[in-house]
């Protein structure tokens, strides 16, 4: 009986030990793979770091930055304006243009509640010069004009080192015109609530903070907005498009800047504008090809001066 009991106890404790052995075996296997797991995690971290480094290097490497509205910024896919300019010039181009924006500031009474305000040229130039896009990034979720490309375009623009940029193109004007923004203030030439004042202010700030940066103005393109007359006839409260264009040309002369005169020279007018745009203002694929090629060729001419 004692022998049987001893045998039973032996089997009992042997069986009790098996799970421990199994646990120890699993633990040993896990320990064995720790170096592999650690190496994998390290590789991912390094890869992510390299990717971020490449991204940041890419942001540093742009020769040309476009600042404008939907004429330059709306399309980010086929035959995009910046892509055509890049192909034409061989220069690296970053598209920092945002649809729906003006050169001038608006709504001075409630500027902190007007979330679209911070992407207008004069406000964006403040961010570029101060190297602080906090306001723009905070406003973006509530921006009623924002398109799908805004978040990435703004995030990447905030990483561009303008000390390494050769040229910036300032293209705004269509929305100042169609929105009836005041043309100019004779008593204050740097009044940012006017089209002319905002342009002068933006040019002055960029020149002061980035003295080696070449600034080129680009006049708005001809347009024919729905249910209105062509832009050389239609006045939305502050003048026809011709007046906004003439003022931009005048400001280029004031500052001794080169200007790419799309309005007068590209060949868009009331007889063909609907062939080159989706709606009388926003360029279609054919229009973007012509526009980007024209701007690129004129840019090369400006760089040779």
In which residue ranges do the predicted regions lie?
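Active-site segments of SGNH/GDSL-like serine hydrolases
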Residues: 169-183, 203-242
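Structural recognition of the beta-strand scaffold that forms the well-ordered cores
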Residues: 63-67, 92-97, 166-172, 214-219, ...
